[in-house]
Regions:
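Catalytic cores of the polymerase beta-like nucleotidyltransferase superfamily
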Residues: 1-262
Length: 262
């Protein structure tokens, strides 16, 4: 991030931290923001886990900080607050956790997305790293499943087989995440994807479409489609493609019908 972006981020998170503290709430930065931050990638999407009613807290945050409240998932209590700070736009996604943050992380999908840090800790660390010596601190990363190690080894690893039972769109997300980051899906996770590949047919089409479009927008799209086929996902989604496997074409064509279709 550039200095203006870091300054805007610190200001936004400071305001949020002060608001949560007034209500005696704990807040943690979790998931994709931590992953991307450790990779040195800038992002303006920040997932915040709070120990209270996330919808109520998000409503208060939008009101106090002059942001826009967006209800994302009423059933699961997830809301977004869009905030403009110093010409930078931030998307704060709020969810609730009960008990300890480790239990919340255990319900996530992949190890590299199952890391967190306390909000105040992150602010202190970023201030120190950005030339504010009055707030020297060391970031305390909450990483019960070895996500940082997998991040360093460039691996996408499922927390358990239950993640695919809970939401089969994660089958596609594993491949898309690996493709975006230029990571590898680790062998046991590949085995689980093959095992659960047919369950992708139970997912609403719009969710499948979103993941596929994101995957196809990346470089080497044909390679990613072949990988989906190796994992049993491609034919689960488009079974008609299977009819072209091994069907030869006139000599002017090098590939069979299936490969030509890809």
């Amino acid at each position: 991030m550039s200095f203006p972006e870091i300054s805007s981020l610190i200001t936004t998170l400071n305001k949020l931290h002060e608001l949560l503290s007034r209500g005696s709430h704990r807040g943690y930065i979790v998931g994709g923001f931590i992953r991307d931050w450790l990779l040195g990638k800038g992002t303006n999407d920040i997932d915040i886990a709070v120990d209270g009613n996330a919808l109520s807290i998000a409503t208060d945050v939008a009101k106090e900080l002059g942001g826009k409240f967006v209800l994302l998932d009423e059933a699961n209590g997830i809301a977004r607050v869009v905030i403009m700070e110093k010409e930078q736009q931030w998307y704060l996604d709020f969810s609730s956790f009960s008990g300890d943050i480790e239990s919340d992380l255990a319900r996530r999908d992949f190890t590299i997305d199952a890391m967190a840090t306390e909000l105040g800790q992150f602010i202190g660390y970023e201030c120190a790293a950005s030339g504010f010596p009055e707030k020297q601190s060391q970031l305390k990363l909450i990483d019960p499943f070895g996500g940082k190690n997998d991040l360093e080894n460039r691996i996408v690893r499922a927390l358990s087989d239950q993640i695919f039972e809970a939401d089969a769109v994660r089958l596609l997300r594993a491949v898309r995440l690996a493709a975006e980051l230029d990571f590898a899906v680790e062998p046991e996770t590949e085995r689980l994807i093959r095992c659960y590949s047919q369950t992708i047919t139970k997912i609403p089409g719009e969710r499948v479409r979103e993941e596929l479009l994101r995957l196809l927008s990346l470089p080497r799209a044909c390679y990613h489609l072949r990988y989906l086929d190796q994992l049993g996902l491609l034919l689960a989604l488009i079974p008609e493609l299977g009819e072209g496997k091994g069907v030869e074409q006139p000599t002017v064509h090098f590939w069979d019908v299936f490969d030509h279709s890809l």
